[in-house]
Amino acid sequence: MKFQLVSDFKPMGDQPTAIASLVNGINDQEKYQTLLGVTGSGKTFTIANVVEQVQVPTLVLAHNKTLAAQLYSEFKAFFPNNAVEYFVSYYDYYQPEAYIPVTGVYIEKDLSINEDIERMRLSTTSALLSGRRDVLVVASVSCLYGIGNPLEFQKNVISIEEGQTLTRTKFMHQLVQSLYARTTADFLHGNFRVKGDVIDIFPGYSETPIRVHFFGNEIELIESFDRETNKTIERLDKLNIYPANMFVTSPDVLQAAIRDIQDDLVKQIEFFQSVGKTLEAKRLEERTNFDLEMIRELGYCSGIENYSRYLDRRPPGSRPFCLIDYFPKDFLMVIDESHATVPQVRAMYGGDRSRKENLVEYGFRLPAAMDNRPLKFEEFEALQNQVIYVSATPADYELQKCGGVYVEQVIRPTGLLDPKIEVRPSKNQIDDLLEEIQKCVEEDQRVLVTTLTKRMAEELTKYLTKMEVRCRYVHSDVDTLERIEIMQDLRKGLFDVLIGVNLLREGLDLPEVSLVAILDADKEGFLRSARSMTQTVGRAARNIDGRAIMYADKITDSMRVTIEETAYRREKQMNYNLTHGITPQPLHKKIENALSKSPITEFHYENTPKKKEHSPTKPMSRGELEKEIQQTRKLMEAASKELDFIQAAHYRDLLKELQEKLQESSL
């Protein structure tokens, strides 16, 4: 199947030129290209058009889960008939294993896996190995961490078809080998159940279970069915059943891995004893032997990723397999907000390694644990085929890769202009700012204020609150999902002014913001660099009255670059509007986010505990419990479909409680 773009929009402004230039570059085998696209110019739509024209599997890389979810929603809408997948870290919560030598404290790994994201990750790898060419994966940088060997994953795919000679017993053995678990109770993802000559399988990567009918030693019928009604959805001639887990391993590979682990354990114990580290030697022996016993019995153990090098049959020091290994060689990589994503990729390896070194040195892990890691930056570069960097402010790295040449997209189809920038003296800046805020509030518009330090932001929040301004302060301790909720509250008008140290959140869509105020704009540094200020000013670019005020006593080089670049973009847009008779139109954007709890999420200033929805406390009969379990599962699945993982996790926990109560009632 081919990529087929579905949209009511036609490329406009700079988009047709940008699309043609990028497509020509790909067809001419250019390895690196940069799309310099301003806020609101439709960069995602441009990339969607490029993907439709070049027709190659595509990886879109974002630097956090929230942006990945936003991009996933947009690409899913553009390509409703194609395989648009979402691949991010499946941890709701993750505390990595660590040892702090100074205090002698060992921190055990603690985590909570989001089953819905795990299903979407499996859906991604299954789609990529299916041979389909119309696969677009939106991923966070977590896709550069190690996952299972694609060859082992492919080896454990079960292919069946109608009329095939296959015993029921052999088929069940194949399912177990592919990490499906037989069940007689709840029929969940990664389970199969047997009723006479019929075997039901619930793939780990799909919403739709499969039913296989046997007649003797022959497959008589294959069909998909509705889990709730049990009705047939579709009859299938043939089917590939992909493993229920990415870390699937063949029995012969598992045995070879166990032998290698034992050999390395002996060597490391001998090393520790030779340098007088008897405590470390004893600790490593006990921990590793316990893990080996678990692997022999169950095929896995807690922390099995630390043995991934053995299971992947990789030499010491080699890079792990990652999502990119599942793509064909001719894939396209799009790095969104590249000025932020590339540095994040560059920093991943170092942070992981320092933690692992302590675990190995003090006998908590074998040295092979060091090879369970994210890619080094040079390994990431070596895996690239063709890359498009996308940013409103490309960094030197991207421009150097492209020889200083970039594709420009500064015209907005809506006709909206870049904000006007004013420079005002820093003396009496707070009084002046208060006046400007009051003007915006009267027009039902919002304001962003960026300060240099947390303390300044806190003091300004207190002062404005005292002056009866409805304001909030956002800081680095606020997690991603809560930050999105705060942004939504700003858009809804629950408060008027958002204050923070670093508000240049890439991809932030806030059409209601008409004023961005930058305090102490002349204090050179990371937060007042040309790139940072251009991003910050751009937050007002989606409002028809958008403007920015820089409070400063002198104009720095960074300020000058930002002012000149913004003026150039304004002029270009004005000329385009004049030539084509376009009147700038205000942007009306629905207040929602793929990760939010609802289209408009409630957020309270005080940290009041939110009421748990659908949380029964009264004693229930067995029948009532079963009904409640069914209803809760439906709510969990509905939340998951909307990518509302917080709410889905709440229903998941509630479901576990109800299932435990049901089990107790049957004793």
Where do the model's predicted regions map?
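ASCE RecA-like P-loop NTPase motor cores
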Residues: M1-P599, M636
